[in-house]
Amino acid sequence: MRHTSSFVTLLCAALLALLVSACGGGGGGSGGSSSSSSSGTTSLSAGPTVTNTSPSPQVVAANAVRVTVDSGVSNVPNMPFVSITICAPGTSECQTIDHILVDTGSWGVRVFASQLPAAMALPQQKDASGHLVAECMQFFDGYTWGSVKLADLQIAGEKAASLPIQVIDPNYASVPSDCASVGASRNTPGTLQANGILGIGVFKHDCGANCVQQAVAGTYYGCSGTTCTSIPLAEALQVANPIPYFATDNNGSMLSLPTVSGGAQSVSGQLVFGIGTQTNNALGSAQVIGVSPSNGTFTTVQNGTTYSSSILDSGSTGLFFQTSVMPACASPNSAYYCPASTESLSAMIQGVNGTTSAVSFSVGNATTISQTYSGDSALPLLAGPAFVTSSIFDWGLPFFYGRNVYAAVEQQTTPGGTGPYVAY
């Protein structure tokens, strides 16, 4: 059941999701850069039925894991979660962590030190000079801080051995000033609104070539004792998207969620690894949208406005873009739009490969949604202008409902061509 003041939480989640997707690294060999308070509860009638029309339910195969959109860690809607297992490299000493956010708009695995057994000894990453490596993952309004460690990651039947991950820990060394100055700390599950992040976008590493030749402030650090200094870092040592490090099914992923009409208390779908590697991840007639090899973006044209920095981002709780067509809600819900009635809109998505795709979508009144569908975790009509510039169109989780959405990893071969691209 949703708290009546939950739109404060909604706002925070939207901010976080935008941040994760916008501030990742990426670019691989190409270079580039790449979310409560409560005042009681009320009993409400159930929202409209979830219609599983497209995609159809499937048996979960060895290369797939169940995805759930539910109330999660902080009762925030439109957050898709999976469970992952972290193991000390080469051992059976493992910990399974639930409610990990599936984020197609970022790259790399991030978990909390507090959720790992104290006895689990994950080796810390070192750079070529022997520095212990730490990372500041920047968001628009905050950051996560912690060491970079090596772990065996297991999800479904897939495994990535000795994968560099970020272990979020506010007590690791001392947070550098150029990291802390970014904004609020997101170093607990409550402030991150998830138990971690599974970043499975189109790039292999979270900073890519940007961080190789020179130190990038507020990113990677070499630490000695409690002192940490910005350092450059080879791509192979950076926090990594696990998919290209799987033995098979390693060229991308497909996120499949059911159609939702109005709202639903929870929904379940699948995250399938690989594109065209198994019978359950065929590309079929999906439209391949080429993205920039430097930052993973494409172009959206909506109502005559061109948004040159567009992304497909499962880690965002709504569709976020600036427009004069609809008014924003009154404070404190100004992160979202509040049209007088549900708006039926259309847009044209344009890939860097020349592919164009018409998309229809709807935007509801966020204040009305919070009242009508209180307690629901899947809300397909949420959209807003929150913290995006005029060039950004963030196609968040509402876009994913009722679709199979693919993300092809850079430099990996697929039936739709070599990544990076997205498809649906």
Question: For each predicted feature, which ranges?
Answer:
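C-terminal motif of bacterial Sec signal peptides marking the signal peptidase cleavage site
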Residues: L19-A22
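Signature of the N-terminal lobe/flap region of pepsin-like aspartyl proteases
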Residues: E93-Q95, V102-P176
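Aspartyl protease active-site motif detector
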Residues: I84-D127, G196-F203, V291-P339, G396
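Bacterial N-terminal signal peptides that target proteins for export
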Residues: M1-L11
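Aspartic protease catalytic domain
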Residues: G354-Y424
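Aspartyl protease catalytic domain
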Residues: G40-P77, S162-T306, G417-V422
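Short conserved beta-strand and strand-loop elements enriched in small hydrophobics
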Residues: V82-A88, E135-M137, K149-G157, F298-T300, ...
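Bacterial signal peptide processing site
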Residues: G24-G29
